[in-house]
């Protein structure tokens, strides 16, 4: 069973009513919700003007203390037994699914230079899906051995293989860079590069960068989602904790960065324009 926590804080009123509020004790309301065979324990902690005392919830929360589904606005003490659930696996799937869908729309994939930025080597199984559309693929990773088997398989089935390297400079001329995990270090790219990643980058990048994804939540799950939670975060919990792996096939309908939002159609139009600009610059040089 998954556990979600909502905090409702009531400010103490003034005067006599405020005295009454002082006598009111914090309380927890628990509701068990069900969707598609999955159960969610939704705890609403009601606080009357005090700092929440989450230790009172230990028995209610049970074994889920270190993976509580909640808003990032809820802050647990560093030495607390309570930890907010965080996992990027589902968001990585959204990133790669959109990239593959975008490539499937292109009629110029044979000329595309594609980069995969995967320092931890966690996304090696993604390689064959990319090479289905282009044979000019460069993987930048600190764990090249993680890509050995997939490269061998691609060579057997497609007669081509990717370039696997630790050198980020090799990404400079890529038209599309796919980074399924949050980018923490800068790497080489150019102004005509489209970069799809997971979470807002922590480093300066050149190009068009998109990192937040939007989609319609499957029927049923939307009814059990706490209102204050973002859809992507809640589905991440369903995927990783609730083993709802079918969510991993979702293709986003929109994506955004810090200043712009794109539909899949407008993203493709922008990608096509970037590619043409890149080709024009190459011809001029």
PLM-predicted stretches and their roles:
Residues 15-23, 78-83, 128-130, 148-158:
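Short, aromatic/basic amphipathic alpha-helical patches
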Residues 83-101:
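A glycine-rich, Thr/Ser-enriched phosphate-binding loop motif common to dinucleotide/cofactor-binding enzymes
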Residues 75-79, 123-125, 144-151, 184-187, ...:
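Short, charged/polar "capping" segments at the starts of alpha-helices
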Residues 8-17, 22-78, 100, 271-285:
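Metallocofactor- and cofactor-centric catalytic cores in central/energy metabolism, strongly enriched
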């Amino acid at each position: 069973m998954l556990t979600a926590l909502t905090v409702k804080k009531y400010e103490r009123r003034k005067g006599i009513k405020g005295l009454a509020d002082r006598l009111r004790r914090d309380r927890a309301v628990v509701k068990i919700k069900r969707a598609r065979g999955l159960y969610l324990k939704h705890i609403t902690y009601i606080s009357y003007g005090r700092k929440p005392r989450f230790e009172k919830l230990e028995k209610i929360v049970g074994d889920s203390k270190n993976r509580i589904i909640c808003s990032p606005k809820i802050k647990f003490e560093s030495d607390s037994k309570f930890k907010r659930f965080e996992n990027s696996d589902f968001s990585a799937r959204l990133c790669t699914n959109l990239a593959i869908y975008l490539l499937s729309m292109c009629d110029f994939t044979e000329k595309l230079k594609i980069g995969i930025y995967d320092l931890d080597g966690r996304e090696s199984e993604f390689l064959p899906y990319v090479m289905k559309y282009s044979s000019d693929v460069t993987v930048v990773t600190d764990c090249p051995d993680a890509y050995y088997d997939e490269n061998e398989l691609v060579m057997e089935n497609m007669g081509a293989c990717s370039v696997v390297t630790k050198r980020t400079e090799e990404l400079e001329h890529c038209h599309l860079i796919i980074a399924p995990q949050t980018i923490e270090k800068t790497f080489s790219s150019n102004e005509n590069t489209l970069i799809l990643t997971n979470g807002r980058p922590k480093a300066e990048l050149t190009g068009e960068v998109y990192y937040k994804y939007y989609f319609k939540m499957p029927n049923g799950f939307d009814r059990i989602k706490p209102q204050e939670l973002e859809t992507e975060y809640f589905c991440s919990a369903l995927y990783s904790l609730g083993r709802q792996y079918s969510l991993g096939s979702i293709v986003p309908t929109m994506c955004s960065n810090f200043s712009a939002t794109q539909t899949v159609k407008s993203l493709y139009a922008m990608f096509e324009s970037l590619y043409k600009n890149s080709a024009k610059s190459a011809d001029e040089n």
